[in-house]
Amino acid sequence: QMCIRDRVLQNLLDEGISIRDLLTIFETLADHAATTRDTDVLTEYVRQSLKRAISSKYFPANETTSVITLDPKVEQEIMASVKQTEQGAYLTLDPETTKAIMNSVQNEVTKLENMGKTPIVITSPIVRMYFKKLTEDYFKDLIVVSYNEIESNVELQSVGIISRDGDK
């Protein structure tokens, strides 16, 4: 039990998420401990319960935040490539697809950086952790947030889409 809790806390810290609200974190872990022992999945549940903190960290109040979204086709390809094992899940995307997606990420990230903005990618909840895994070797500090981690009063504007063909 100890190592599951510690892994989830480490996962949160690795992505720059505050773990000050230990009560919420431990309550969420207790709520879901019976259904899964996968620390990546548990981390996603905890992130969703910390949506207020995540929203205030990345999305200033009374301001529209420019974000990058994922083409639904890319989300489908990522989910289709997920393989579950005893040790957890991993992606089996072929190198060509991975390269095409990374090129698109690079283009969109550069576009936002050139506008003086922090690149933030918004994904559907089920894809978030896999997209983060896919990109972390190339874009270590890329912020990836799921729709379920964003408060309803946050104003977002999509200024780019990560697609496989990169020319969208």
Question: For each of these PLM feature ranges, what is it?
Answer:
Residues 2-4:
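Short, small-residue-biased leader/transition segments that mark boundaries at the very start
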Residues 6, 11-12:
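Long, non-coiled-coil amphipathic alpha-helical linker/lever segments
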Residues 17-168:
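Extended, low-charge hydrophobic alpha-helical regions
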